[in-house]
A protein has these predicted regions:
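N-terminal subdomain of lithium-sensitive/metallo-dependent phosphomonoesterases centered on the IMPase/IPPase/PAP
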Residues: 1-83, 165
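Residue-level signal for inorganic ion chemistry
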Residues: 15, 19, 42, 53, ...
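Solvent-exposed alpha-helices and their adjacent loops that cap or buttress functional pockets
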Residues: 30, 70-72, 105, 123, ...
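A structural micro-motif
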Residues: 60, 128, 174-175
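DPxDG-like acidic metal-binding loop motif
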Residues: 72-131, 148
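Short, solvent-exposed loop/turn motifs
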Residues: 108, 136-138
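An extended, acidic
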Residues: 138-196
Length: 196
């Protein structure tokens, strides 16, 4: 594991432990838009991650869910969602995760998802494959929608009419459709072949 992936793993785990320790203890909820929120936990977890990155890689750029952009013209850019699934977290639904991606010259080179509730760490590095808790994983080999279990998530960017049309098409064509409320959880399930 290279230094970048090592820091991403350490930062995700540290933020994830903080999030897990504060599950059910949200003190502050800030509205970021019509159907988008951030909590005090989102902000503190993001700070944990950014501090870990800056200690080791002070010149790298950062694009973070809560605090925005910093030095994004750099060769290396870290993309951070400290608490993906905030709505679930606010409602004490244990489906959320920490998501960190690293881009080098506009190409993804490493990614980490940490699921605090299950202590599951998903890590991938360009050219080295993907792993769950240090065990190699792979995506599903299903290539027909009618045999696939897929995920759909509503988005604040699209109208309800557009979302219902897309969901209807998926529901008609897929074997099964899930809505989990956390892209990090969905992507981790795709990475290990639980979702197609």
């Amino acid at each position: 594991m290279n230094d970048i992936l090592t820091i991403a793993v350490e930062a995700a785990k540290e933020a994830g432990r903080f999030i897990g320790d504060n599950f059910g203890k949200v003190k502050e909820i800030n509205r970021k838009g019509d159907r988008n929120f951030a909590t005090d936990i989102d902000h503190k977890a993001e700070k944990i991650i950014i501090d870990a990155i800056k200690r080791k890689f002070p010149g790298h750029g950062i694009l973070a869910e809560e605090s925005g952009k910093s030095n994004i013209g750099r060769e290396y850019i870290w993309i951070i969602d400290p608490l993906d699934g905030t709505h679930n977290f606010i409602r004490d639904i244990n489906i959320f995760g920490v998501s960190i991606g690293v881009v080098y010259k506009k190409e993804f080179v490493a990614g980490v998802i940490y699921i605090p509730s299950d202590e599951e760490l998903y890590a991938a590095e360009k050219g080295a494959g993907a792993y769950k808790n240090n065990r190699k994983i792979s995506v599903s080999l299903k290539d027909r929608l009618k045999e696939s279990c897929v995920s759909f998530d509503s988005s604040i960017r699209y109208s309800p009419k557009v979302m219902l049309k897309a969901l209807g098409a998926l529901a008609k064509g897929a074997f099964n459709v899930r809505m989990l409320g956390s892209s990090a959880r969905v992507l981790s399930y795709i990475a290990e072949g639980k979702l197609d």
